[in-house]
Amino acid sequence: MKFGMNLLLWTGAMNDDMIPVVASLKEMGYDGVEVPVFEDNIDLYTQWGSRLQEMGLECTAVTVRGEEDNPISSDPAVRALGVENNKRALDNAAAAGAIRLVGPYHSALGVFSGQGPTEDEWKWGVDS
């Protein structure tokens, strides 16, 4: 069994202040960390991927979609932005060396209709 820690406990944006935190997690025996991917910055995530690899830590990544980029919105422009932002998140997670990307990114975090998905929402989710 492997153990990892989600860095959202400390930050929503990776920066140099996280270096001692990540080093401490490695010293405690964690096998990996989950990196927040909330910005489009390939260079930043490439740098963090190298750091994590040098420390001997595995990397996973987390991202979310909001109301403004909801992949199952009834607004085609909002859906398109959601799909584009998911692609960017995948690119940034890959730059960090992440072995998986978790969400929720299939729909907007915290946006609820009070009922199950409609046929259109289901289709938009599949298309995204």
For each feature predicted by the language model, list its residue ranges:
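Acidic (Asp/Glu)-rich catalytic clusters
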Residues: 20-27, 42-63, 88-98
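Short, glycine/charged-enriched secondary-structure capping and boundary segments
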Residues: 18-20, 47-50, 76, 115-118
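Active-site acidic/histidine proton-transfer and metal-coordination neighborhood
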Residues: 76-128
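Histidine-acidic metal/acid-base catalytic patches
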Residues: 1-9, 14-29, 97-99
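Acidic-and-aromatic substrate-binding clefts and catalytic sites of carbohydrate-active enzymes
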Residues: 10-16, 35-47, 70-72, 109-113
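Hydrophobic faces of well-ordered beta-strands that scaffold small-molecule active sites
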Residues: 3-7, 33-35, 59-64, 101-103
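Conserved, mostly hydrophobic/aromatic
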Residues: 5, 25, 33, 52, ...
